[in-house]
Amino acid sequence: MGGEPGIGKSTLSLQIALAANGLKTLYVSGEESAEQIKMRAARIGIGNDECLIYPETLLENIVAQIAEHRPDLVVIDSIQTIYTDLLDSSAGSVSQIRECAATLLKYAKSTGTSIFIIGHITKDGSIAGPKILEHIVDVVLQFEGDSNNIYRIL
C-alpha cells in the first residue's frame, strides 16, 4: 500500500493487524517505536493480544522473528526502512528494496504467511523503489485523500 506521508497508511495497517481477531499478527515498524504504536492502537480503540509489535529495520532480524512466532499476517511499515546486511547500499535504495521484498516474498510463498507491505510514494505519486516491487505483490493499493482532506480513498 502506498500513499503520501501522513495520509494514514500506518494507522490503516495497524487497524487491519489489530482487527484480525483469531489470527496471529506481527506488525514490524521501521519508523516508530513500540510505545508510539501502542499509543496509536489505544487511540483507535482496538486491542488484540495476538498482535505482536516489533520495531526493527534489519531484514535478517525480521525474518528470524517471523520464523520464531509464525504469524498468519505480517505488516511491514515500511519497505523503504528495511535493509539487509548482504548489500552495502543504504535502506531505501533500489537494490535494498528489491532484495528485501524478494526475501519476504520467498518466505510468504514457502509458509503461506500473508505479508502486507507499506511503501512511500514519489513526488509524481508512484510507489517509490523499483518497478519490480509492484509486479511481485498480489495487490497494489493507493491510499489518497480527497481535495478537502475530509475523506480517504483506497
Set out the residue ranges of the language-model regions.
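Conserved inter-motif catalytic segment of the P-loop NTP-binding fold
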Residues: 4-7, 11-103
